Amino acid sequence: MLNEFEEYIKGNFSDDYWYDDALFLCEDFLKHFSDLEWTLLISKMQNYDIQSQVRLAECLADVNNKYSVKILIILTQTENSNLLITCIDSLRDANFSLLTVEEKHNVSINAKKVLI
């Protein structure tokens, strides 16, 4: 399923198609990812181009699990303002109660870095 997901977020789609169809397909892919697929996504996402990272962040807005929050926090470590804004917007409704105490601490540290 990860390969199909990557085809969509890396695809050369119009904005209309992305926001009308592909975004929802990608959200559905993510909601059915195994732990292994999430781990692979985390290891691969830094190599995605900015547009693909923005699309990933957009998809994660409605995927509430510990992996989605972790990915969004990692992606906030960017110089690209569009990606940063998308991550912050997606984090707005994140369920931080899904994280362990240590993961919450790491989120706090990373959030402080973003604000500096």
Q: What residue spans do the PLM features occupy?
A:
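Amphipathic alpha-helical scaffolding segments comprising HEAT/armadillo-like alpha-solenoid repeats
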Residues: 2-8, 31-44, 65-77, 97-115
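Structural detector for internal amphipathic alpha-helices that build alpha-solenoid repeat scaffolds
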Residues: 10-32, 54-64, 74, 85-102
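Short, contiguous, helix-prone interaction/anchoring segments in small proteins
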Residues: 38-53, 59
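Short coil turns that connect the paired helices of HEAT/ARM alpha-solenoid repeats
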Residues: 15, 45-51, 76-82, 113-116
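Alpha-helix boundary/capping and short turn/kink residues
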Residues: 35, 50, 62-65, 81
